[in-house]
């Protein structure tokens, strides 16, 4: 778990794999203790930043304390950024193979994996802080383990393996989630108790 010292922040997730990855990436330098909690949040629609802010404000209302929420997008350049923030629903219905099939008629198979962590100090009326990370890649035929979303069909630029095929130690130093968490961790370390 991220550092036990410092205050606790609720990380809103019911996804054990996501929590495991976040804790592994943050390591022991993160100055707050993350406490995972699953809560029901509305499925907002809109642009990624808008969705993250709305989710974070609603989570802060429900938790009545400091919260972090995460939103992930997978944006296909050939489709103008879709499925974007709706990737969860696409994946649920058509699986990784269907994501690849969506681009069959397009030469451009490039995609952007985007992760946004949103933090609220507990007062939903205060400013929500956003921390973003993105990784460029290609949508490929699924390869590797099928236990973590669309990882089997996203091959980051500069690699021959998909996220699913990469060792966790490698993925967790290049992924969109890593980049967003690094930005968030740096901010918390720098600002300490002022956050």
Swiss-Prot record:
Its main location: cytoplasm. Keywords: Cytoplasm, Hydrolase, Magnesium, Manganese, Metal-binding, Nucleotide metabolism, Nucleotide-binding. GO terms for cellular component: cytoplasm. ITP binds at residues 13-18, 55, 71-72, 88, 148-151, 171, 176-177. It is found in: Cytoplasm. One of its GO terms (molecular function) is nucleotide binding. It comes from the Eukaryota. Signal peptide: none annotated. Its EC number is 3.6.1.66. GO terms for biological process: deoxyribonucleoside triphosphate catabolic process; nucleoside triphosphate catabolic process; nucleotide metabolic process. CDD domains: HAM1 (cd00515). Its cofactor is Mg(2+); Mn(2+). Disulfide bonds: none annotated. Binds 1 divalent metal cation per subunit; can use either Mg(2+) or Mn(2+). SUPFAM superfamilies: ITPase-like. It catalyses: ITP + H2O = IMP + diphosphate + H(+); dITP + H2O = dIMP + diphosphate + H(+); XTP + H2O = XMP + diphosphate + H(+); N(6)-hydroxy-dATP + H2O = N(6)-hydroxy-dAMP + diphosphate + H(+). Mg(2+) binds at residue 43. Belongs to the HAM1 NTPase family. Pyrophosphatase that hydrolyzes the non-canonical purine nucleotides inosine triphosphate (ITP), deoxyinosine triphosphate (dITP) as well as 2'-deoxy-N-6-hydroxylaminopurine triphosphate (dHAPTP) and xanthosine 5'-triphosphate (XTP) to their respective monophosphate derivatives. The enzyme does not distinguish between the deoxy- and ribose forms. Probably excludes non-canonical purines from RNA and DNA precursor pools, thus preventing their incorporation into RNA and DNA and avoiding chromosomal lesions. PANTHER family: INOSINE TRIPHOSPHATE PYROPHOSPHATASE (PTHR11067:SF9), INOSINE TRIPHOSPHATE PYROPHOSPHATASE/HAM1 PROTEIN (PTHR11067). Homodimer. HAMAP family: HAM1_NTPase (MF_03148). This is Inosine triphosphate pyrophosphatase. It comes from Xenopus laevis (African clawed frog). The gene is itpa.
């Amino acid at each position: 778990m991220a550092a036990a010292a410092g205050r606790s922040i609720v990380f809103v997730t019911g996804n054990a794999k996501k929590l495991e990855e976040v804790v592994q990436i943050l390591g022991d330098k993160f100055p707050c203790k993350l406490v995972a909690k699953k809560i029901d949040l509305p499925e907002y629609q809109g642009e990624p930043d808008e969705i993250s802010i709305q989710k974070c404000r609603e989570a802060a209302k429900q938790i009545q304390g400091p919260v972090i929420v995460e939103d992930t997008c997978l944006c296909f350049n050939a489709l103008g950024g879709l499925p974007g923030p709706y990737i969860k629903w696409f994946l649920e219905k058509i699986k990784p193979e269907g994501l690849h099939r969506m681009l069959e008629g397009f030469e451009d198979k490039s995609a952007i994996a985007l992760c946004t962590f949103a933090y609220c100090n507990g007062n939903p009326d205060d400013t929500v802080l956003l921390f973003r990370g993105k990784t460029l890649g290609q949508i490929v035929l699924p390869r590797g383990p099928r236990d973590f979303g669309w990882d089997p069909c996203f091959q980051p630029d500069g690699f021959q393996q998909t996220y699913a095929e990469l060792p966790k130690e490698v993925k967790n130093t290049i992924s969109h989630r890593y980049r967003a968490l690094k930005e968030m961790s740096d901010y918390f370390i720098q600002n300490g108790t002022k956050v």
